[in-house]
Amino acid sequence: MIAKNFLLLLCFIALVNVESSPDEAVMIALRDSLKLSGNPNWSGSDPCKWSMFIKCDASNRVTAIQIGDRGISGKLPPDLGKLTSLTKFEVMRNRLTGPIPSLAGLKSLVTVYANDNDFTSVPEDFFSGLSSLQHVSLDNNPFDSWVIPPSLENATSLVDFSAVNCNLSGKIPDYLFEGKDFSSLTTLKLSYNSLVCEFPMNFSDSRVQVLMLNGQKGREKLHGSISFLQKMTSLTNVTLQGNSFSGPLPDFSGLVSLKSFNVRENQLSGLVPSSLFELQSLSDVALGNNLLQGPTPNFTAPDIKPDLNGLNSFCLDTPGTSCDPRVNTLLSIVEAFGYPVNFAEKWKGNDPCSGWVGITCTGTDITVINFKNLGLNGTISPRFADFASLRVINLSQNNLNGTIPQELAKLSNLKTLDVSKNRLCGEVPRFNTTIVNTTGNFEDCPNGNAGKKASSNAGKIVGSVIGILLALLLIGVAIFFLVKKKMQYHKMHPQQQSSDQDAFKITIENLCTGVSESGFSGNDAHLGEAGNIVISIQVLRDATYNFDEKNILGRGGFGIVYKGELHDGTKIAVKRMESSIISGKGLDEFKSEIAVLTRVRHRNLVVLHGYCLEGNERLLVYQYMPQGTLSRHIFYWKEEGLRPLEWTRRLIIALDVARGVEYLHTLAHQSFIHRDLKPSNILLGDDMHAKVADFGLVRLAPEGTQSIETKIAGTFGYLAPEYAVTGRVTTKVDVYSFGVILMELLTGRKALDVARSEEEVHLATWFRRMFINKGSFPKAIDEAMEVNEETLRSINIVAELANQCSSREPRDRPDMNHVVNVLVSLVVQWKPTERSSDSEDIYGIDYDTPLPQLILDSCFFGDNTLTSIPSRPSELESTFKSGQGR
């Protein structure tokens, strides 16, 4: 009897096990959490008896959930990871929301298709223990920003992994390209995300066939070289469109199965390799909107459809036509630098003598190659020696390594070779008459021979140091006596003007500096006695297309400002002075005042590069500011199609202007009062930092001359009361104008706007009234700005500062150093760019430099106030921070 009862109990337990599968509770929770459409027949408690979309094995364990394309909505329950026999999880193309539950530990899981839903997140352990996982698709889900979790490294059976348009960020893991661990992975699709990495280069034996990484979002995107492709010899389809990849195309000779190759809209440069356009398997290729150079490729595959439309820098349009030999040689030279983007952007066409950056020609012969301070990496190519006409090679201030090629010693016409301030090593070739500058180079080459030569090198180094010190001592003594003699001469002959032979001159050939045997030739530009650049009228006519009206940037009381472009693309601003403004001023007086202005250098003052005096023409050449005036960005941003300035940017601009004016008032070698400070005299660069323009120009107008419609220099709305009434000028005049500019930055309104109601015409009066009434002041803030509690706090401080600066009595206005201190405390982070000045002479100008490079160097030099202007008086030390750094 006992045995019979025990047998019945065992049967009952077995029956319960059959009826109550371990997966039953999980599946019922799944059913109850979803809103099913149609009639899926999910009734009853046994999921194995539900519709064909649920599959079970012989043990009543759920092995497949295949409910894709069913119009299902709802959230997935968190316990799906308990379905330990699950092999297929397919919920794609529904309306599912919430997080995807963790499936960690499901060793039998092969397929996960969750694409085209509204899932919000992926758990970090999602892929843990999924050793059988082969197929994954997470495309088109609005996940919170996520990265590929480390747990994916366990899924070494992966065949295809797709996470397109699902807010993926960060880096692509190296292991996905390692054939040893992921030998089955053939498809990787990560398009339309926010990936920002450079590709790994140390993987091997990748089996990936389909690689889709196109359309990454954000500013950085995927970048760096694509040379990793040549290691991926199984590739059939590659799509990298819409990223920031740069450098040359790799060797494709090993990619014999490649059918489709799309790298449109990147920054790839260099030549299209023959290994690509001779690839017979290729049927679809897209290279448009890059910076590719050399001849237009001629693809030979029978059914290929090449897409070369859009920007590139091919020398000729006809496929397969060779470039000019000079072009080929120059491209070989920059190949050693990795085909830098700045060359690819500016070297257009098939004639390097037609204005290519860094290239100067005499006739059709290249005589000067000037690649100074271009951030170049790589080595010096021996192909420089192919240009027998070369007289100057300047590769200084780059990051070049390796040795100086022996072939360069064969250049019989070479007069100057400057490779200073690089990372070169090895022996310098023997040149006959060439002046070679190698300072800042030559540590031991990493070739294993340093130890053998250590003892001999030590003696050489000691001898060299002693020789150099003696030479420097002799040179210093010689310079001292020469300068002393010259000073005595000028004291004896104060009225004698320097002739062409007395001035340092710059030779310009084809609007660019070359080298002449005597050192003096050409009249395109030279250095005046004060070291500022004197530029010929012809250069400026060419740069502005003969002062074409289409090039007008603006009109002011002192004349018209034109945009100019030198032959190599360097942009300048040319102010053509009204003849009535300077007619009463003597030539010497005008030149001396220009000399004063060209020496005023600060990062927040627009650089005056030089001038032109020919006949009745009086022209000033300024630094070009690409983003135009501040007024364009605060008053006319809608009309110009610009984005409104956010408050933090306005605050930084205010600080920039304050620093510039502070420098003029107290820190320059002599005090300046601007007298016409306003948004149209504040210019913005591409980095949206501000520089003050037209400072000191009132000095160029003779007494009594009207600079605008008033009898004084200034603009209504910005004029301090005492200046407008009496003409009395102090630095507090500029402080008042600055206060009005702060009001404009805060409100987006003009200082004087006759289109407004009578009580709102004058901004300063209206602003004070609004500020006093705290309840109405928020209405005065520019609606284009987003304002929160934090910004409102700083806005109130700046508003109070604006009122102080525009006080009626000058004594109630703060000095600009106080203004700077207030604004500095509000700008959370401001880090000045560190730049070192490298003076070539007493004026910091290299006479063998092309005019465009002089302009660039002048901008560079202008950023270093400590080298161009004497330091501030010591008694200001406790009051001011650095005039450059604040």
Swiss-Prot record:
Pfam families: LRR_8, LRRNT_2, Pkinase
GO cellular component: membrane
SMART domains: LRR_TYP (SM00369), S_TKc (SM00220)
Keywords: ATP-binding, Disulfide bond, Glycoprotein, Kinase, Leucine-rich repeat, Membrane, Nucleotide-binding, Receptor, Repeat, Serine/threonine-protein kinase, Signal, Transferase, Transmembrane, Transmembrane helix
Binding of ATP, residues: L553, G554, R555, G556, G557, F558, G559, I560, V561, K575
Subcellular location: Membrane
Catalysed reaction, written as an equation: L-seryl-[protein] + ATP = O-phospho-L-seryl-[protein] + ADP + H(+); L-threonyl-[protein] + ATP = O-phospho-L-threonyl-[protein] + ADP + H(+)
Entry keyword Phosphoprotein: no
Signal sequence bounds: 1-20
LRR repeat ranges per the UniProt record: 59-83, 84-106, 107-129, 131-155, 157-179, 182-206, 208-232, 233-254, 255-279, 281-302, 363-386, 387-410, 411-438
Residues linked to a glycan: N41, N154, N167, N202, N237, N298, N377, N394, N401, N432, N437
Catalytic residues (UniProt): D676
Gene inactivation effect: No visible phenotype. Tmk1 and tmk2 double mutants, tmk2 and tmk3 double mutants, tmk1, tmk2 and tmk3 triple mutants and tmk2, tmk3 and tmk4 triple mutants have no visible phenotypes. Tmk1, tmk2 and tmk4 triple mutants have a severe reduction in organ size, a substantial delay in growth and development, and a decrease in fertility. Tmk1, tmk2, tmk3 and tmk4 quadruple mutants are embryo lethal.
Stretches of the chain found on the membrane's Extracellular side: 21-460
Tissue specificity annotation: Expressed in siliques and flowers.
Topological region Cytoplasmic: 482-886
Residues of the Protein kinase domain: 547-827
Alphabetized PANTHER family for the sequence: OSJNBA0070M12.3 PROTEIN, RECEPTOR-LIKE KINASE TMK2
Free-text comment on this protein's domains from its UniProt entry: The leucine-rich repeat (LRR) domain is disrupted by a non-LRR region, resulting in the formation of two LRR solenoid structures shaped like the Arabic number '7'. This is strikingly different from the horseshoe structures of the canonical LRR proteins.
Family recorded in the similarity comment: Belongs to the protein kinase superfamily. Ser/Thr protein kinase family.
Function: Involved in auxin signal transduction and cell expansion and proliferation regulation.
The protein, known as: Receptor-like kinase TMK2
